[in-house]
């Protein structure tokens, strides 16, 4: 099945497959979790420190050869919390289709902590470099919000 096309059918604005080796992990990003702006640090098991050390999460992600990057682009006037939730629900929907097709071993990095999935901040992934490697735009001088 073409997972990029399937992702777009579900409602993602963009999707791309990239080599996981091209993901850039920045251990210093862990401080964003430690600042606890989302209120999940030391509370949600999908979040640090319960989710694992930076090194453990790096190894977990790198154990996969390929990464399916999913992007949602929204108008800047929408509620980012609702947009992240929608991104996560669509990701979950696509993951269920992938599992039904026999792809049982999936690692989901969510847009913010979601259920038992850790977010990209917890994994310390550089979203800009990931977007570049996937041929997507992360930040732009427009009124759009982009979620991965």
State the predicted function of each range.
Residues 1-148:
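Auxiliary alpha/beta "docking" domains used to position bulky ligands
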